[in-house]
Amino acid sequence: MQIFVKTLTGKTITLEVESSDTIENVKTKIQDKEGIPPDQQRLIFAGKQLEDGRTLSDYNNQKESTLHLVLRLRGGMQIFVKTLTGKTITLEVESSDTIENVKTKIQDKEGIPPDQQRLIFAGKQLEDGRTLSDYNIQKESTLHLVLRLRGGMQIFVKTITGKTITLEVESSDTIENVKTKIQDKEGIPPDQQRLIFAGKQLEDGRTLSDYNIQKESTLHLVLRLRGGMQIFVKTLTGKTITLEVESSDTIENVKTKIQDKEGIPPDQQRLIFAGKQLEDGRTLSDYNLQKESTLHLVLRLRGGMQIFVKTLTGKTITLEVESSDTIENVKTKIQDKEGIPPDQQRLIFAGKQLEDGRTLSDYNIQKESTLHLVLRLRGGMQIFVKTLTGKTITLEVESSDTIENVKTKIQDKEGIPPDQQRLIFAGKQLEDGRTLSDYNIQKESTLHLVLRLRGGM
């Protein structure tokens, strides 16, 4: 039969195979066609990495199925896995290994079934389908292994109608898992469910234990509104388009509706609401868009440009961007290239730290401009700010925060505009563009806040 293999460059290779061929055989056929050694090939089907010893039929690969080919980074590395008993296991891995692969390696060494393993890195629970490089796990990183509790617990879910559903769960279940269990019982699709506990809306990727949900806790289930509403989209020409939508529609859905009405491809559309560029994967309700809200439609400029990003190690990365890309988009492109999560990236241009919601054109960043990438230190800290009245304010900050950021945090707490604030540490007035670490301000340091006289010079 014929199957297709799609590479990251978008090229599609056609192979003649049999259901009984092993994945290893398939890799050899790819080598014959493309010259890529099997040990550099990773084949993905239905989101799963295929193992050499298995056959196509094991994975239910049928004629004209499409596999995805990802190249392994050359050369493996060692990582460590620390258990709760304090034992440390050493594993040989590659950056391209999935978390699932790592769990299998742990099973081979320790005999612990993958479904009883939870792996934690940098305080985050790692998802099976992601790779080590997705989480920026590098050589000699240490993961923490927590065993899932065997034997679950009961929790209750109360609906708006007053009905109570009982669920069997484990502390390590994600909110997504819980929604699936509710769907199994009640038939309500997960994307129509919002779960509330202790007044907080629960996020899909988090676990019950993250929210300290214990046995016999009660969650509240709110349905996302079915039943639509009208919103307006205003173009730069002044034309207003009316759309029928639902709160649960994604921004991507909205762009498709605009395409249906106006013929503008989604990838040329930027939607703005309350000064913010809206992200495709988010829903209207995420942005608190209500009936008769007005969005603004800006067209992306066709034809991109190249910019450079220089890291502290001196490495320069080249990115394909558009002037209308947000800083957030740029950070995602850097993550795709370098594996550094956006929340660990700080981008600097012309001495200024760039804000996620702004675009390249907002900062007048043009073709072949160079941005500087500084990594945020993981993990925040507390500092104190003492006012002349003797009041002490506590702030959550990171060493990589600029003085400007700190002043904004003070404004959020105290309502004092940044331009009226002077911050003093160790007898020195602190400059807006510098970071806390530039001044060696460490956890529990105390800054002094002096108010500028109005109309000063």
Curated annotation (Swiss-Prot):
Covalent cross-link Glycyl lysine isopeptide (Gly-Lys) (interchain with K-? in acceptor proteins) as placed by the record, residue numbers:
G76
Tell me which residues make up the Ubiquitin-like domain: 1-76, 77-152, 153-228, 229-304, 305-380, 381-456
Swiss-Prot/TrEMBL puts the cross-link Glycyl lysine isopeptide (Lys-Gly) (interchain with G-Cter in ubiquitin) at: K48
Assigned keywords, A-Z: Cytoplasm, Isopeptide bond, Nucleus, Repeat, Ubl conjugation
Keyword Acetylation recorded: no
The protein's location, in the record's own words, is: Cytoplasm; Nucleus
Superkingdom classification of source: Eukaryota
The keyword Cytoplasm appears for this protein: yes
* Gene Ontology cellular component terms for the protein in this record: cytoplasm; nucleus
- Major place of localization? cytoplasm
Q: Which residues form the propeptide?
A: 457
Q: Which Pfam families match?
A: ubiquitin (PF00240)
Q: Tell me, what does this protein do in biology? A: Ubiquitin exists either covalently attached to another protein, or free (unanchored). When covalently bound, it is conjugated to target proteins via an isopeptide bond either as a monomer (monoubiquitin), a polymer linked via different Lys residues of the ubiquitin (polyubiquitin chains) or a linear polymer linked via the initiator Met of the ubiquitin (linear polyubiquitin chains). Polyubiquitin chains, when attached to a target protein, have different functions depending on the Lys residue of the ubiquitin that is linked: Lys-48-linked is involved in protein degradation via the proteasome.
Q: What else is known?
A: For the sake of clarity sequence features are annotated only for the first chain, and are not repeated for each of the following chains.
Q: Which family does it belong to?
A: Belongs to the ubiquitin family.
**Name of the protein in its database record:** Polyubiquitin
